[in-house]
Every structure is written in structure tokens, then in C-alpha cells.
A protein has these predicted regions:
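Short coil/turn segments at alpha/beta junctions that flank glycine-rich nucleotide-binding fingerprints
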Residues: 9-13, 64, 85, 129
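Short secondary-structure transition hinges
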Residues: 55, 80-118, 139, 165-172
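Short hydrophobic clusters on alpha-helical segments that form packing/core surfaces
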Residues: 2-7, 183
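Helix-turn-helix
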Residues: 6-40, 44
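Hydrophobic alpha-helical connector segments
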Residues: 44, 58-88, 137-144, 173-176, ...
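An amphipathic alpha-helix adjacent to DNA-recognition modules
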Residues: 1, 13-14, 34-58, 72
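Hydrophobic/aromatic residues within well-ordered alpha-helical segments
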Residues: 38, 45, 49, 53, ...
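C-terminal peripheral helix-coil segments that are non-catalytic and often amphipathic
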Residues: 80, 84, 113-129, 133, ...
Length: 198
């Protein structure tokens, strides 16, 4: 979708309907007619991105592997999703806080609530198997999603301060390993550490 490409190119969610129309080759009036307004288009884009990513969560939860293995796969999946859609958290914040209550309710319904529910179920599975310490799902969500957002959005501040470059495939892989170590080091029990090791 042209809107997604523009936000990635510009590292910003500040795009206009005319920018989107020009990028897509469509008429701006047609874009407005189909989505209602820019916020409608952004909501549809986020819903499309979220549907793809969230459908994988049910599949992951059903797999016959340890909760620790599921956790690691989830960490990698979330980071890769942010790598593909680096504007995602900014778009979520915009739609939750700077648009209508209806848009905020929709984002909560199709993104925040299902992801939190997945975290609750995964953490409960790990706790009941003895792999995880008791972990608050809201704090877990905040930690993982916040860390992902900062890598992609906060990268601009880091590049100015330290000279680091853009997020590449290698940086993404390093960050996945780092977050696995950080999160697993915080919530795994000895049984969970044994499951992670082998």
C-alpha cells in the first residue's frame, strides 16, 4: 500500500491523501471516498498489518513446543514486524490519542486487546509448566512493545548521539538475540532455563 511505503520512506506518519494518491497513481478524491479521510486510511492500514501479525499468534500458541520456545519465537516475530512496519507504534499512538474515540476503540479492539490476551495466555502457560516466573502481562506488553518501538523510532536520536546507522537485517538479528536474553533472563525459572538450553 502506498501509505505504508511513504511512511517507511519518510520515517514519519505525516503523509497527506494527495501524497498517497500520487504514490499510488490513484485519484485523491477516490482515496478519500474509499477511506473517508486520512484517519480512515491509516486505521485500515494498521488493521491490515495487525491482522497478518495477529493471525500468527494463535498458530504459535497451538504449537507442541515449550512455552519458552514460543516466547522466543514471539519476541523475534514482534521485532521482525516492527522491522517490516517501523511506523506501527507511532501509528497506534496517533490513532489511540489524536483521532476520534471510535478510532481509538477500533485500535484497542483489533490490536492492543488481542496482543495482551496472547501475552496473558502465553505467560500463564509458561507459569503453569514451571518455566516462567509470575509475570504481569501488562508490564510484559509494555516492555516488549516499548523496546521494539524504541529501536525503530528512537534510532534517530541514537544515530545523532552515537553515530549508529540504520536498522539493517543484522541489527534486527542482534536485537532479537538481545531481547531474548533480556526477557528470558528476567522471567525464566531454572526449569525454563533448562528448556531454553536444550
Amino acid at each position: 500500500m502506498a501509505a505504508s511505503e511513504l511512511m517507511i520512506e519518510r520515517s514519519s506518519i505525516e503523509i497527506s491523501l494527495s501524497d498517497i494518491a500520487q504514490k499510488s497513481g490513484a485519484n485523491a478524491a477516490l482515496v478519500k471516498y474509499h477511506f473517508g479521510n486520512k484517519d480512515g486510511l491509516l486505521l485500515a492500514l494498521l488493521e491490515r498489518n495487525a491482522a497478518t501479525e495477529l493471525s500468527n499468534l494463535e498458530y504459535l500458541l497451538a504449537q507442541p513446543i515449550t512455552a519458552t520456545a514460543k516466547l522466543k519465537l514471539h519476541i523475534g516475530g514482534i521485532i521482525r514486524a516492527y522491522y517490516r512496519f517501523p511506523y506501527m507504534n507511532r501509528l497506534i499512538h496517533y490513532l489511540l490519542h489524536e483521532t476520534s474515540a471510535g478510532s481509538a476503540d477500533e485500535v484497542s479492539k483489533f490490536f492492543v486487546a488481542p496482543l495482551l490476551d496472547f501475552h496473558r495466555r502465553l505467560l500463564a502457560e509458561g507459569e503453569s509448566s514451571g518455566e516462567f516466573r509470575k509475570t504481569d502481562p501488562v508490564l510484559f506488553y509494555t516492555s516488549l512493545i516499548g523496546a521494539c518501538d524504541h529501536l525503530f523510532f528512537g534510532r534517530h536520536a541514537m544515530s545523532r548521539a552515537t553515530g549508529v546507522g540504520p536498522v539493517t537485517d543484522e541489527v534486527c538479528r542482534q536485537y532479537i538475540r538481545h531481547m531474548e536474553t533480556l526477557i528470558c533472563g528476567g522471567i525464566l525459572t531454572q526449569a525454563g532455563e533448562a528448556a531454553a538450553a536444550g
